Swiss-Prot record:
Keyword Signal (UniProt): no
Induction per the UniProt record: Expressed in the early phase of the viral replicative cycle.
Family: Belongs to the orthopoxvirus OPG027 family.
Biological process per Gene Ontology, one example term: symbiont-mediated suppression of host innate immune response
Name assigned to this protein: Interferon antagonist OPG027
Function, as annotated: Inhibits antiviral activity induced by type I interferons. Does not block signal transduction of IFN, but is important to counteract the host antiviral state induced by a pre-treatment with IFN.
Keywords: Early protein, Host-virus interaction, Inhibition of host innate immune response by virus, Viral immunoevasion
Gene: OPG027
Amino acid sequence: MGIQHEFDIIINGDIALRNLQLHKGDNYGCKLKIISNDYKKLKFRFIIRPDWSEIDEVKGLTVFANNYAVKVNKVDDTFYYVIYEAVIHLYNKKTEILIYSDDENELFKHYYPYISLNMISKKYKVKEENYSSPYIEHPLIPYRDYESMD
């Protein structure tokens, strides 16, 4: 049947990007475009719920914002989930963010989802699903303890 992890992103405890994982496979990631009109500091929480059926360890995450590497910290690691956090500073009107476990160009073109977040108008949209079934939850109502960002 193949591996299927679950991958979600929580932004500032207010927006959840759900089901960002691929339908099958050991990779997870997405491309984000964030529009804002002034400086913003956003706290990201990356939640991976691994499928241990065919793997021994979970791949790490790499994050780039406008081609600059973002420091990602692993904050929790249990059998049921692995949580990473990062702070991303938005200086430009448009910020492109790449989040991935594997940066193969083909994955961004045809597999990882592409999501647009307009922080000015509060319009959030899945632009391309590709090989995933993502959806956006706003406002976020955390239903797991590790989803709240205190």
